[in-house]
Regions:
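Mobile, glycine/GP-rich and aromatic-enriched active-site lid/loop segments adjacent to catalytic centers
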Residues: 67, 199-203, 209-273, 278-279, ...
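Helix-loop-beta segment of a Rossmann-like dinucleotide-binding subdomain
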Residues: 65-87, 125, 221-225
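N-terminal FAD cofactor-binding segment of flavoenzymes
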Residues: 20-64
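Predominantly flavin-linked oxidoreductase catalytic cores and closely associated redox partners
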Residues: 99-249
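FAD/FMN-dependent oxidoreductases across multiple families
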Residues: 226-312, 316-338
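C-terminal helical "tail/cap" subdomain of flavin- and related membrane-associated enzymes
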Residues: 314-444
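Short beta-strand to alpha-helix junction loop
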Residues: 76-98, 228-233
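Glycine-rich FAD pyrophosphate-binding loop
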Residues: 4-23
């Protein structure tokens, strides 16, 4: 939609029909702002997506240890109460695709199989297989990879190498239930459709996200080894964890959880792609970097980067940077520095949740609200001193100094997340998997 607004007609290649299943999503405050900027705020209200006023985080005793409200940062630096939405992704994604095509985007039902690479090494489009098994070549001056964790271009080795991150041995087990008891108070923290996060120990937590007026998405994120040790079927595992993980969670489910679908399992590993934009291509969102889903940044990052990529793409198509090895330098640097802020916040939470809670409640409340809202990119047009102070505090807590390589293109991930001697992760078996969703689906 951003490209269309800027006078460019994109061709969207979709391998699977819509609507299609996707895990439910909690939007950040800035994600809601992007939808309003696209003129879709009224549409979101008309459709009836649950309204999110913020996030309640529960400590090990089951108490609401801290509350993060959705707040809008105004140009003068002040904050204003705002709201965003929870969405059932199958419905939301279908709405966004319909909106894009109604505004002028073209859509092709096909499966991209390989990038087209010119003699000079520049990507010039993709080879695709249509639903009637015809192989076609689609040439384009610019290819945008928006395939999410399937990482089409990285897995085809068209980018720099793809490295595993810190959260490379976790999985999420999730489903939907109809008997999660919601709040119904007057305060914003007690509104019925807020997000709830339940913590029990490092890398072991649960979510509850209302996705309509009856159904709540619930899920457990745990180390994969813990899941294997239990030796339980997915649904049995999830049922027990909903009862055992945190008293704040079990206290909101009357009796046994009433599942409205079966349980699902997906890998939850983090990764980082080097050189994720170059001559003829750009990677957007999870297709080049993924950290941890605990604070629901994924959808916002995808939409935010899409806007930044659209601006850079228009300049490139007009000739700016064409013929150079590094036409998207500013895009990559801006994105890397923003995602670094996410990584530092998430790592601080996991490494020292008590100190994190104290910092967010007392010294750096507004700065943490900025980060959790999604204001970690540097183009908000309002003061970000409080955000930067919070980020500096998280890095100090971690004993971390952020450094960048000599070209200024990439952050250098810290500690165990990056070893020069470690071979890059190439998920080169992607061709043998029927669909993106199948790749993300059940492990057993």
């Amino acid at each position: 939609m951003r490209l269309i607004d800027l006078g460019v007609t994109p061709l969207i290649i979709e391998r699977e029909p819509f609507p299609r299943y996707h895990i439910g999503e909690s939007m950040t405050g800035e994600c809601g702002g992007l939808l309003r900027d696209l003129g879709l705020g009224d549409r979101m209200l008309e459709v009836g997506h649950p309204i999110k006023h913020g996030v309640n985080v529960y400590g090990t005793r089951g108490n609401k240890d801290w509350w993060v409200p959705v707040m809008q940062r105004l140009p003068d630096g002040s904050m204003k109460e705002q709201f965003t939405w929870q969405v059932r992704r199958s419905d939301f994604d279908a709405m966004m695709l319909d909106e894009a095509t109604s505004r002028g985007a073209e859509k092709l039902d096909a499966r991209a199989t390989a990038p087209l690479v010119g003699d000079d090494g520049e990507i010039r489009g993709v080879t695709a297989t249509t639903h009637d098994e015809r192989t076609i070549e689609i040439e384009a001056p610019l290819t945008l990879d928006c395939t999410g964790q399937a990482s089409f271009l990285a897995n085809k080795k068209a980018t720099g190498p793809k490295y595993l991150g810190a959260y490379d041995k976790q999985i999420a087990v999730f489903s939907q239930i109809s008997n999660f008891r919601r709040d119904n108070g007057e305060d914003r923290a007690d509104q019925p459709d807020n997000t709830h996060i339940f913590y029990t120990k490092k890398y072991h937590w649960a979510w509850a996200i209302p996705i309509d007026d009856q159904v709540t998405s619930v899920g457990i994120v745990i180390p994969a080894e813990y899941f294997r040790e239990k030796g339980e079927q997915k649904t049995d595992f999830l049922r027990r964890e909903l009862h055992d993980l945190n008293p704040g969670l079990s206290g909101r489910i009357d009796g046994e959880p009433v599942f409205v679908e079966g349980a699902h399992v997906i890998p939850n590993y983090s990764f980082q792609v080097r050189k994720f934009a170059g001559p003829g291509y750009m990677c957007v969102g999870d297709s080049h970097r993924f950290i941890d889903p605990i604070f629901s940044f994924g959808l916002y990052v995808a939409m935010k980067e899409a806007g930044l990529a659209a601006n850079a793409a228009v300049k490139y198509l007009a000739g700016e940077g064409r013929g150079t090895d590094d036409p998207f330098h500013d895009y990559m640097v801006g994105v890397e520095m923003a995602i670094d802020r996410i990584e530092d916040l998430v790592d601080a939470f996991w490494e020292n949740p008590l100190a994190f809670a104290v910092m967010t409640h007392r010294k750096f409340r507004n700065g943490t609200i900025d980060n959790l809202a999604g204001r970690f990119f540097d183009d908000h047009g309002c003061p970000m001193e409080e955000r930067d102070a919070a980020t500096a505090a998280f890095r100090k807590l971690l004993g971390r100094d952020r450094s960048y390589d000599e070209s200024g293109l990439y952050s250098m991930p810290i500690g165990s997340r990056f070893h020069p001697e470690r071979a890059p992760l190439w998920n080169s078996n992607l061709d043998s998997i029927a669909t993106t969703e199948a790749w993300m689906r059940d492990l057993d």
